[in-house]
Amino acid sequence: MDSDAKSRNDAPIIKLSIDLIKTYKHINQVYYTAKAKKKQQAQQQAQQQAQQLQQQAQQQQHQLQQQQQLLQQQQQQQQQQQQQQQQQQQQQQQQQQQQQQYQQQHNNNINNNNNNSNINNKNNNNNNTNFNTSNNNNNTNNNSNNNSNNNNSNNNNNNNNINNINNININNKNNNNNNNNNNNINNINNNNNKNNNNNNNNNNNDDNNNINNNNSNNNNNNNNNNNNNNNNNNNNNNNNNSNNNNNNNNLNNNNSNNNYNNNTTTTSSSNNNNNNKQSKYNDGYDDENADYIVRIGEVFVDRFEIISSLGKGSFGQVVKAFDSVLKEYVAIKIIKNKVPFYNQALIEIRLLELMNNKDPEDQYKIIKLKHHFKFRNHLCIVTELLSYNLYDLLRNTHFHGVSLNLIKKFAHQILTALFFMSTPEVDVIHCDLKPENILLRNPKRSAIKIIDFGSSCHSNERMYKYIQSRFYRSPEILLELEYSFSIDMWSLGCILVEMHVGEPLFSGQNEQDQLTKIIEVLDLPPSHMIDSSPKAKKFFTKDPINSTYQLKKNEKLKTNVEFCKKKLSEIIGVETGGPQSRRKNEPGHALVDYLKFLDLIEKMLIYDPQKRITPLEALQHSFFLTDETSQPPQQQSQQQSQQQSQQQSQQQSQQQSQQRRQSNTDNNFSNNNPINNYNSPSSKSPHQQLQQQQQQQQQQQQQQQQQQQQQQQQQQQTYSPTTQQSNHKLVDQMKKASMKDKSPHSNISNILNDSEEDNSKVHINSNTSDNMQARINFQVENQSNIYNNNNNNNNNNNNNNNNNNSNNYNNSNELSPNPPILPNLKDLLPHNNNNI
């Protein structure tokens, strides 16, 4: 029993011991397996390190090999350079030897020429005396002269030995034969000696490259030879710097030819240097400014052939090209090869596509985008080809400005475009409206289009603060305030004044000076705009007592310009007949017309952008509505007479109808109440009524006669024979001037006769000179009133010859358009006005 109990008690101990042994074995296995894994990892790491070391060693060996190869190449290049230098030295030595030989031969020729000069000029006593004083040993016999001729022939052959080795024997034989013949004939006939000697002298002169007469050469042999020696020495120095081939070929050439060849070699080397520099930029396609190097005749993307360059700008350049697919001329804007310009051009393409899609009928004066592509890392924008810009138009008027009638046409079209851009569907701010960005569609028409949307943006995507050209920059941009569509309206106001006056309205040299120019005309901006401006302290000083602002002095200007106020009415010339009275007594430039123009400009140039006039309000302004005052005096008088006659006829008809009605009513009353109607008109007898009607008719006839007499007097004043003759003379002069100008846009007679499509035409008479000294003819043909308007101008020119001579071609007659009041976008363009 005890043993069983003990065995029972020992059983758990035995189990524990067995479990411990098992766990120990397991721990040992885990330990050894971990050791084995660590060993394997260590071995793998060691292998990886060894591989890395091997790779590094291989790379180092490869680098060493490359360095050795570079060293070998450098050594080879040095050896080649040394060999080239040795060859050059040898060539220079050969050249020097050849030049020394040439000089010796040339000196021999000089002596021989001096000997021959006495023979050739026996009849010229003056020449012989000159040679006797300079060379006393030159007086020899005929036989000795014949010997000298033989020497000359030999010397000439020696000169030819340098370049023509194969022809030596032939030349020597011919020359020796000639000399033998001369020796046989010399003693008999001296005249033959003279001829032969002249031939020899001509040969010598050919070697020296003198093409003058024989006598003059003989008179100045010594001086010319000395000069030739000096020139040869100079040529030697030049030839040492040039190639060997040129030196060998230039031994028998003129000094001028040697210099020309040397110059060409140097220029070619400089061109090579330039090509090496240019090859650094976009594989040689671009210049240092990242602009594409345009080559005339080059074809872009197998479609557009470059015709000519139209201009350059900060964005890149514009070229004229021919589209081989559409068979038309186009303009290509080649953007610079820089990322900022590329990204901005993408925005311009997106905006043009948006506006063109919203305007499929091309009514709203925005340039048409035709295509765009990338060519040699340059983004290219293809648009329709237009004509001159408004600045070119202004320059061709010699900066005298254009008439209000033409400004009315331009302003109406630009406002049409601005209204279209301000619609919610388009929502585009141009941000750079100026005369250079407004182009004529045709040089003979007043239709325009707006271009260059490279700075444009949506009203809710304003990216830049520094926008607009300085002369046309709005005050909110100068003061760094928030801006909207109204900045384009400010620019338009500045443009319209400049187009009429001929000079920029606000021409500041910097931002502070620009603000000064604006304040001179429009006074200080509102205080709330200055208060909210981050540049207030830069431009203004605030009075702490009165809380008023004053403009700071401009210290950056080189010249001290005193602050002086100007009136906008004086700049435009409202009361003086235009700027410098250039438009005085012209049709369409009356005081009322100028007052309307001034009112429109003042509303465009209001400081507060919220109070500034909108495009739709501007289109409804009275400046664009036709009035009697805006028409020529003759048309006014004719219209007045027509209106008066119409009124009189209406009055007559009304009186007759009233009399009939009264007679009918009076008869009724008289039948009913014959006693009580004594005071009524019906109480009068029919005879009295007829007398009254006759008197009224007589009065009307007298008034009509007076009006006709007044019209005849006006016609006699305007259509006098002298004015008609002067008018025809003026037309003849214009036609003669057009015959002289052979440019395609200078046919004035066509403009005077062409009145089918456009009653208001702009004509730029452009020459091909760089200065573009052209005349601009703004011709208006109004069917039956062409000569009426011309006669008015002739009368004005006769009264003001000194003032209006410069404007005979610039200020012709123009009629203002008749745009209606436009409430909607669809009704924006006039339906019955095709003259724009």
Curated annotation (Swiss-Prot):
Protein name as annotated: Probable serine/threonine-protein kinase dyrk1
Regions that span the bilayer: none
UniProt-annotated catalytic positions: D432 (proton acceptor)
Gene3D superfamilies from the UniProt entry: Phosphorylase Kinase, domain 1, Transferase(Phosphotransferase) domain 1
CC per GO annotation: nucleus
Keyword terms, alphabetized: ATP-binding, Kinase, Nucleotide-binding, Serine/threonine-protein kinase, Transferase
Catalytic activities: L-seryl-[protein] + ATP = O-phospho-L-seryl-[protein] + ADP + H(+); L-threonyl-[protein] + ATP = O-phospho-L-threonyl-[protein] + ADP + H(+); L-tyrosyl-[protein] + ATP = O-phospho-L-tyrosyl-[protein] + ADP + H(+)
Positions of the UniProt region annotated as Disordered: 99-286, 627-697, 718-767, 785-836
EC id: 2.7.12.1
Basic and acidic residues: bias regions: 729-744
InterPro entries to which the protein is assigned, alphabetical: Kinase-like_dom_sf, PKc_DYR1A/1B, Prot_kinase_dom, Protein_kinase_ATP_BS, Ser/Thr_kinase_AS, Ser_Thr_dual-spec_kinase
Keyword Nucleotide-binding included in the entry's annotation: yes
CDD domains according to UniProt: PKc_DYRK1 (cd14226)
Protein family (similarity comment): Belongs to the protein kinase superfamily. CMGC Ser/Thr protein kinase family. MNB/DYRK subfamily.
Organism of origin: Dictyostelium discoideum (Social amoeba)
PROSITE patterns, per database record: PROTEIN_KINASE_ATP, PROTEIN_KINASE_DOM, PROTEIN_KINASE_ST
Bias type Polar residues, positions: 718-728
Biased composition (Low complexity): 99-278, 630-697, 785-816
Gene Ontology molecular function: ATP binding; protein serine kinase activity; protein serine/threonine kinase activity; protein serine/threonine/tyrosine kinase activity; protein tyrosine kinase activity; transcription coactivator activity
Binding site for ATP: L310, G311, K312, G313, S314, F315, G316, Q317, V318, K333
Ranges where the Protein kinase domain occurs: 304-624
Pfam families assigned: Pkinase
GO process terms (BP): positive regulation of DNA-templated transcription
